[in-house]
Amino acid sequence: MDTSSKENAHLFHKNSAQPAGGPSFKAGYPSTEEARPCCGKLKVFLGALSFVYFAKALTEGYLKSTITQIERRFDIPSSLVGIIDGSFEIGNLLVITFVSYFGAKLHRPKIIGAGCLVMGFGTMLIAVPQFFMEKYSYEKYERYSPSSNLTPNISPCYLESSSPSPRSIVGKSQNKINDECEVDTSSSMWVYVFLGNLLRGLGETPIQPLGIAYLDDFASEDNAAFYIGCVQTVAIIGPIFGFLLGSLCAKLYVDIGFVNLDHITITPKDPQWVGAWWLGYLIAGFLSLLAAVPFWCLPKTLPRSQSREDSGSSSEKSKFITDDPVNYQMAPREESMKIMEMARDFLPSLKSLFRNPVYILYLCASTVQFNSLFGMVTYKPKYIEQQYGQSSSKANFVIGLINIPAVALGIFSGGIVMKKFRLGICEATKLYLGSSVFGYLLFLSLFALGCENSSVAGLTVSYQGTKPVSYHERALFSDCNSRCKCSDSKWEPMCGDNGITYASACLAGCQSSSRSGKNIIFSNCTCVGFAAPKSGNWSGMMGRCQKDNGCSQMFLYFLVISVITSYTLSLGGIPGYILLLRCIQPQLKSFALGIYTLAVRVLAGIPAPVYFGVLIDTSCLKWGFKKCGSRGSCRLYDSHAFRHIYLGLTTLLGTVSVFLSTAVLLVLKKKYVSKRSSFITAREKIVMSSSVKKETCAARDHGLQPKYWPGKETRL
């Protein structure tokens, strides 16, 4: 070929790959030759989507790790904390349907980038109350503070002979309450946390439906499951860092940098300790803002893989976007016509989804299972703290370092299994169902791995320390502290030398106190001697008694079973997601994912933390009270009731989801069997028709003379 012909060929190739005016001779997406330089953009999108998944998952994990910190800082019950946690789902609910449906027809990467900006600002808004609230004030005797120049022999017990009359005490207390109520302006600052989490939910909305559908559209069928598995795995790595960040911040005092830490008398092991919960939200918000940058540089569409083009599977965008890529820049009139066309097709598309029995059953199964998982994950740190006596920092640390990696490994393993064995939709459903069955069977064993209640005088054991106390026998007053003028609303736990915790040193009947560093020692405690009369040491120390060594052993067993259960349940994550993508029409993919996300948010994400929190609150033994006398957060839980509510509700919901998943498999098998039988019947008819035609043609050709068909004697 000469030079001029080469130039003409090059010019023809250039013009055909990048048409200037007329329609391309290749319909649909850019040609393969043009696609090769741009194929790396799919990997860029994969990396950007993975990072934003990491950022949003880190924030979500950090939020779960600060549940107890927020509860104590704002002095609110678990049910209200559940509402704050569910505000994220409420934000999703407001826009998920429109974003998933209309967003699929617009510039998906830029919509995701805008969502990241909103999510980042919302995350930072959560931390704002810390800078406007008063300094954290935990329940304590002011004269026991190191800054109050404590002198020895001050009696926590106001003896009846030397104390003012009960009427004067009540009057002074009421006046103090009224004064504090006037200056307590931070009682409702939790609303900003609610609004920030709501805004975070709004920004997160387009990431999952648009991002996953974008990947599935432009990746090959073999790589789609693997790419989604990579994204989901990175999303699970996010909570690891979220919980570890929560563990680090929980060790720092809430007002660090604003107060003298030498004056703080409590430690991270104290039930009243509040860590620097606000610090992690500033870090997570910055990461979300940073994650928005790459999406503004990515194109609206990418070249499709050759396998997808050969298979003829239609993109979700092919229904409303023209085949010529040059025509993506539409005039305003054409753009408005497109939007009207999409709006008219909304209800038919919705009806098509709800007429799909596999989609509806899987939607119900996933919703019930996510109720189980949302409730379990939200209150898992609190469960570890209350059941096994661990600090908030340690609870977050073990979840982030042990549990979350098991979930990540399970999700990644599910993607590898799907890719390695090329599982079909029925096999994927079986793997999804099997992982759920074995996971919840393992979860049942956690019922046997509980600890006994802490020995708290008047609440879990009698003041004699010899027998448990029933619900009707609970009373913080006894003969041993009858001469003291104590408040039963205070929670200033003191650990006696007899191993029993008392609600306060006053209720323990202590008549003197002294300080050793930050520790406060109480002496001559009549109730301590009442439970151990033979012991000559009737003293105690500020703080709650630690649980016995047997509970530490149970905690190790709990971690082992919890890790195995987490891996088993997460193994079915990717197969279940592939089932969701393959049981619907390709052009409805983003819309179906949006409806799926909407249902999970509305029916699981919002209510699950709330009703889990309400039921957990019923196991509270000792409530705290705010300055104005209203009920605050729970100070002490009944370990047995907490365990049965937390584990029982999770198992019940998981069992229901297993039955619904079984129905999905049965309907799917029936649907495929009927389709296969109809396909075989149609194929047999075609084969029989072809054989008849061949015989007829052979008979006709046999009667023709060869001269009319020169060279065709052997035809047919």
Curated annotation (Swiss-Prot):
Residues 474-529 form the Kazal-like domain. The chain crosses the membrane at residues 44-63, 83-103, 110-134, 188-216, 236-256, 275-299, 353-374, 395-418, 423-446, 559-581, 591-616, 651-668. Disulfide bonds join 480-510, 486-506, 495-527. Its main location: membrane. The lineage of its organism: Eukaryota, Metazoa, Chordata, Craniata, Vertebrata. GO terms for biological process: bile acid and bile salt transport; monoatomic ion transport; positive regulation of thyroid hormone generation; sodium-independent organic anion transport; thyroid hormone transport; transmembrane transport. SUPFAM superfamilies: Kazal-type serine protease inhibitors, MFS general substrate transporter. Gene3D superfamilies: 3.30.60.30, MFS general substrate transporter like domains (1.20.1250.20). It is a multi-pass membrane protein. One of its GO terms (cellular component) is basolateral plasma membrane. InterPro entries: Kazal_dom, Kazal_dom_sf, MFS_dom, MFS_trans_sf, OATP. It comes from Rattus norvegicus. Glycans are attached at residues 453, 524, 537. This is Solute carrier organic anion transporter family member 1C1. One of its GO terms (molecular function) is organic anion transmembrane transporter activity. Pfam families: Kazal_2 (PF07648), OATP (PF03137).
